């Protein structure tokens, strides 16, 4: 009714796809046909930013409407890096070098400016070089700049107005209570207080102007596009040869589709669990049925509990094997534990399937369960290999666990 624009803001990476789903619903809603006030925020530090722009352009074409897009560099970098490490992702969803983000920002800006019929571009920046580059790229195209209240006045006083560049700048001011705004203000402090921040460097008299306005293309060429050498991939964050346990990103629709396909192949499988004894034939007995606690008509498998006689056999076998095993080097023991961990990860989906079906765990809890088992094996194997010696660390002998 009042043609007030509304932007869907950008937050952590795992919320991007659900935000795009919401954008699609709104843009294609029949009640909003012709309304050009629907906006979306895209973060240039995300590696998939250019492809998100392609998606928004395609969506605008399908809706025969124009979508407002605000391009920012991104304010959750620290948490994105940490989350990727904690979740055991294959790689980081964001760039690990600041100048890669700066270059991505300019590349995304050029792509947005080239889609005037589908996108109304808005560039949120306090970086003088980014501003000048966009002004040069844009020529006579329609767009606006944006800045935060209290931060961009010095820069944009030289941009706004007919006596300057004659460009529009929308000023963003946070509104709300202390409790609501605290997290927002902390993010702004972290973002602009970082040593690599343009705002931070601008007030530093030790930084020459030539270094302040360096072309990010030159920096990327100097490093041949390589990632930050101080950042190992998420699976290689631990010292030595210890590998982080692999996780799954449940916010990624492609990974969800693959997970669904992998898990479905095991639903028809019925498992049998019984005592496993060396040189001893387990007697036949009535097995106990195990059902899925979340779906009672789903029989997961059958369990045959050990008898007292079989426990005696297991203990006897362990006692017979103990002298040879206790003489095995810690490195060999660690290698076997590592192999066990690798085999669990090789059978990742089936392990997850069993945890979900037998214990009734959610997918996220099941993934954490499998990862914990793998990680414990690798953690203690590393300790055994590096810190144990048969001359100083004596085994306590066979132990029966119930």
Language-model features and meaning:
Residues 1-243:
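Positively charged, amphipathic and often flexible ligand-engagement surfaces
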Residues 4-26, 40, 134, 336-337, ...:
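Extended, hydrophobic alpha-helical segments in both membrane/secreted and soluble proteins
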Residues 60, 138, 322-326, 344:
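Hydrophobic residues in alpha-helical segments
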């Amino acid at each position: 009714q009042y043609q007030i624009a509304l932007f869907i803001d950008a937050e952590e990476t795992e919320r991007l796809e659900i935000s795009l789903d919401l954008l699609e619903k709104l843009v294609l809603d029949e009640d909003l046909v012709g309304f050009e006030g629907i906006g979306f925020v895209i973060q240039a530090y995300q590696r998939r930013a250019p492809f998100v722009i392609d998606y928004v352009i395609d969506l605008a074409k399908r809706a025969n409407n124009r979508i407002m897009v605000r391009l920012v560099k991104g304010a959750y970098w620290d948490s994105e890096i940490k989350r990727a490490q904690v979740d055991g992702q294959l790689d980081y969803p964001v760039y690990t070098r600041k100048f890669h983000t700066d270059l991505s920002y300019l590349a995304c800006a050029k792509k947005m400016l080239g889609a005037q019929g589908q996108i109304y571009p808005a560039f949120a920046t306090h970086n003088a070089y980014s501003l000048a580059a966009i002004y040069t790229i844009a020529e006579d195209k329609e767009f606006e700049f944006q800045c935060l209240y209290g931060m961009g006045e010095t820069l944009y006083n030289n941009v706004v107005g007919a006596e300057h560049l004659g460009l529009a700048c929308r000023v963003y001011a946070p509104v709300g209570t202390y409790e609501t705004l605290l997290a927002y203000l902390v993010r702004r402090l972290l973002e602009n207080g970082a040593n690599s921040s343009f705002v931070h460097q601008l007030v530093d008299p030790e930084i020459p102007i030539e270094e302040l306005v360096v072309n990010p293309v030159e920096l990327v060429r100097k490093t041949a596009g390589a990632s930050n050498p101080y950042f190992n991939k998420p699976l290689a964050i631990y010292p030595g040869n210890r590998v982080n346990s692999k996780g799954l990103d449940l916010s990624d629709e492609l990974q969800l589709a693959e997970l669904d396909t992998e898990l479905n192949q095991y639903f028809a499988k019925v498992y049998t669990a019984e005592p496993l004894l060396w040189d001893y034939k387990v007697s036949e007995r009535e097995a106990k049925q195990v059902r899925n606690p979340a779906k009672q008509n789903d029989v997961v498998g059958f369990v045959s509990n050990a008898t007292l006689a079989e426990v005696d056999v297991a203990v006897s076998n362990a006692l017979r094997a103990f002298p040879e095993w206790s003489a095995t080097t810690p490195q060999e023991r660690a290698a076997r534990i590592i192999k066990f961990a690798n085999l669990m990860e090789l059978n990742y989906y089936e392990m997850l399937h069993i945890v979900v079906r037998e214990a009734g765990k959610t997918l996220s809890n099941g993934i954490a369960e499998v990862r914990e088992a793998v990680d414990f094996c690798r953690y203690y194997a590393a300790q055994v290999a590096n810190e144990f010696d048969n001359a100083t660390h004596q085994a306590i002998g066979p132990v029966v666990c119930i």
